[in-house]
Every structure is written in structure tokens, then in C-alpha cells.
Amino acid sequence: MTEKRNLSFGQLFNLSFGFFGVQIAYALQSANISRIFATLGADPHQLSFFWVLPPLMGMIVQPLVGKYSDKTWNRLGRRKPYLIVGALIAVAVMLLLPNAGNFTFGQSLFLGLNAAMWFGLFSLMFLDTSINIAMQPFKMMVGDMVNEEQKGLAYSIQSFLCNAGSLAGYIFPILFTWVGIANTAPEGVIPDSVKWSFYIGAAILMLCVLYTFVTVKELNPEEYAKFHGLATKKDEKKEDPSFIKLLINAPSTFWTVGLVQFFCWAAFLFMWTYSNGAIATQCFSWDGVNTAAEAFQTAGNWVGVCFAIQAVGSMLWALIMPTLEKYFHNKGAYAISLIVGALGFISTLFVTNQYVLLVSYAFIGAAWAAMLAVPFTILTNSLKGDNMGYYLGLFNCTICLPQIVAALIGGAILKYICAGSQIGMLVAAGVLLILGAISVVLIKEGKK
């Protein structure tokens, strides 16, 4: 074991393959949650509030996964036990969530939401919690086992597999509709095309996580210490650092990359929340009221297609990211990608043809590709190895917090700034990405 050893491409691939299945689950959630809750009876101005729970749970869970997996050393591995636990919970919830409308929970309960919505909310909370438990270890294992020279490649592979999983998850509903599974249902009931998408996604998630679990051998404590140039437990007993102490000692890149993350993830929260309504009104002449209408549910399928094209664009952009990083370095590649994504968001305002709209979402994919790879490359290169998992867990707050803020203020922005126009929220997302690109100049790379 040498500090500068390289992993083969196959080893790097195995490290992240389970991410393919996890991302299918995440894609199904991202593309269908607004559709599901609108079908259950949510008002468009309420939709963003349903998106508070996923990032909130992520902000709580991922730092805990990072902290405790840093201290987990057993025969199953260090990070891998969390993969299995997260995947098992996610599979169970994916079988329940799309059936929320089948339990005839019609009565209005707390905050004016019917019982089906509350059932869906709690299912969503557990789904996102479990996805977070399963997702975070993949990023940590790259930080644990890959040297600085290969991290860019490792996270690019992860980004590619992530987007491939997204592509599969996004097209499931329209694919099942094409083969004859019903895409409409009685009012308040989720269509079968969506239900079967979640069922198949759950099966693939479990298989992919099992593949990584079986094929990856994590470093033992002695190997890990040698790889990262740390003292072993035999050499030194270190006090477990507190949350506050870790934040105080965080490298400046933690905060500057986090600022860029704030604008980026707020933008994508708006995309996930409002794409269904925006596309339905912009391209399918939806009346803005009847969510059981064919126009709304057809638009719901097309959202999946748009997100799939975004994933394809992201995969293609991920392939050229190493070249961009070579000529413009990490920061330049990051900023360029965000600007391309911003143009994609803003262009949706002028598009009324559903097929032309695909070009806009392909451009948006450039920003997504950069968001999945560059921040983690910059951050992990600035960290020492002893609290890598905890810092990556804390860094997840820069993903979750902006989504929470965007979810809380999204309804007000829709009402008072965008005058009820959901397509206006996509333009707002483009403006946020431009602010993110400008903020890239504040990042200083390298270890503290």
C-alpha cells in the first residue's frame, strides 16, 4: 500500500456503481413528487412546502452518517453497512409512497392537508432519509480510497453513473405508458404508470447497492491511516472533535464552495417543484386547475422526458469536464457549466413546443454535471483524511439548506414576483445559477 497508488478504472467504477440505483430512486422522487402531491390535491402555491422535508432530513441524516461511519470499522466495512441499511428502507418506502391515494384518505386534517397528503409526506420523509443514508457513503468511499490525482476521474465516473440512473428513473413513467400501463386514474389516485416506475426502481436500487457492497473492499484502519498520512489508533488517541470545532477549523473552500452550492441547489429545487405545472401550461394547454386532466398527466410524463434529456446532457457534459478542467481548471469549468445551465433555464420562457423544450433541458444538464463532481473534488482536495466523512456530511448542509430556503419562499416568489406563472420560476432558477457562477471567483483551492 503506497500513498500515491492508483486504482484501476474497474475499481473506480465498482466504487460508484451502486450510485446508479440510488439515483434511479432519487430521479423518481425528483420528477414525480410535485405530480403526486398535485394529484392528491395540493395547490400550486403549496407545492414548494412539500419539498422542505427531503432536504431537511438530508441535512440531519448525512452529517450523522458521516460522523458515525468515520468511526465504524467492522468486518462489513466502514461505509458499506450504511449502504445496505439505506437501500432496504428506501425499497420499503418506494413500494408505499405511490399508493398514498389508494387509501381513500379524503378528510382534511392539520394545516388543511388531507390524510393522503400526510401519508405521502411521511413516506417522502422516510424515502429521502433512506436515499441520503445510501447516497452519502459513495462520496465518502471516493474520499477514503482515491488519491488526489484520480479524484476528478472518480467523481466524473460517479457523475456519469448518477446521470445514467437519472435517465432510467425519469423515463420509466412514459415508458410504461407506451407499453400500455394506464397514465390516468380517478381523481386523487396516482396512475399505475407512476406506481410501476417506483416498483421497478426499488428492485434496481437493491441490486446495484448489493453489487458495490460485494465488489468493493474498503481500507482497514491501518491501511487508511497510511494512505492519508495519519497516526494510527495505536500511535495516538485523538479526542473526537465537536461539531462546532469542526466548523471553526473547516477550510475556506468549505464555505466558498458552499456559497456557490446555495445558488445552485435553490435553482434546482425550483426546477423539480415547478417543471410539471410550467410544462403543462406552456406546452400542453393545461387549464391550471384539474390535475386529473390528461393534459396535466401527459405533461407529468414529459417532465420525465425533459429530466431524462437533462441527464443525457449531463452525461455528455461530464465527458468533456476533464478537458475543461485541463484548460480552465476546476473553477473555470465550474463557472462555465453553471452559465450554460442558466441559459437553459431562461430559454424555457420562450419555448412553447415540447420538443424544442428538450434543448433547454439539455443545457441545464451542464450545470448538473458540474454540481455533482466539481464541488466534491475541490472540497476533498482541501481536507485531511481524519474527518473526511464528517466534513462531507456537514457539506451536505450546503445542498440541503438552500433547498429548504427555496421551498419556504417558493410560494411567495410564485405569487408576488412571478404572478402565479410557474414558468417564471424556471427563469428565476436561471438567475440563481448566474449568481452561482459569479460566486465561483471566491473559491481558493488547496489544503488549508
Regions found by a protein language model. Name each.
Residues 325-375:
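C-terminal transmembrane helical hairpin of 12-TM major facilitator-type secondary transporters
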Residues 44-45, 148-158, 300, 383-395:
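Loop-to-transmembrane helix entry/capping segments in MFS-fold secondary transporters
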Residues 2-57, 256, 260, 264-289:
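Helix-loop boundary and gating motifs at the non-cytosolic
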Residues 133-146, 370-384:
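Intracellular juxtamembrane helix-capping segments at the cytosolic ends
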Residues 60-76, 316-329, 414:
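Helix-to-loop junctions at the C-terminal end of transmembrane segments
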Residues 386-416:
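A late C-terminal transmembrane helix in Major Facilitator Superfamily
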Residues 84-113, 340-352:
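C-terminal ends and interior cores of transmembrane alpha-helices
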Residues 1-10, 106-107, 111-123, 133-134, ...:
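Intracellular loop-helix junctions on the cytosolic face of multi-pass helical membrane proteins
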